[in-house]
Amino acid sequence: KAGDVLLLDDGKIILEVERSEGLKIVTTVIQSGVLYSNKGVNLRGGGLSAHALTDKDKKDILIAAKADADYVALSFPVNADDVRETKKLLKEAGSSASVISKIERAESLADDVIQEILNESAGIMIARGDLGVEIGDAQLPAVQKRLIKLARSSDKIVITATQMLESMIANPVATRAEVFDVANAVLDGTDAVMLSAETAVGEYPVNAVKAMSDVCLEAEKSRRASLSRHRLHSHFEDVDYSIAMSAMYAAN
């Protein structure tokens, strides 16, 4: 509708909607740039009506099933129904693959919605690119910490991804800020950190993998990292479990 702001290619191009005419949208370019094919479109604040599973996604699920994939990453789930549909398609294709839900939509962050998504998924990926475009980069750090904590309390896998070592696409060494970013994700309890363009199109893919591995190994030596290694499911709120966990931590 008029006044909506569309963000293209991870926010590099910004358009403001003037009016819509059926399937045609007339916009004013607020921030220009070169738009390449297959780039994403986000609505500032969330609310796009696009379905999580496209026809191409459904075909790709069949390919993943034939390839005997262990995991399938579901992009842009709005709610748990999207996860359930993906699991249904995998089952019908004869696949036992688990679903990792990529948290990229503002709508999926509501307390009840994210918990239902976690309950239906093997784990979540904190996909900071599209998520940051929708909610704003300033909110990302707190949201990332919240999602890691929620995943761990639900005993689910959590992966932190996007621009972890972005500068290493073109440089052989990471910035200090990137080192801190990776280390803090590990210290918060993420199960995995993931490289994207750094290894897909970067000039120093091996350096990037080694740099990330080195940071993770050093962060895991921290006492804080050892304390976050155990998942505290809600049943540990019982007195007996709490005493047992306290004894274990004291012994360690």
Per-range role (PLM):
Residues 1-252:
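Non-catalytic helical/linker scaffolds that mediate oligomerization, partner binding
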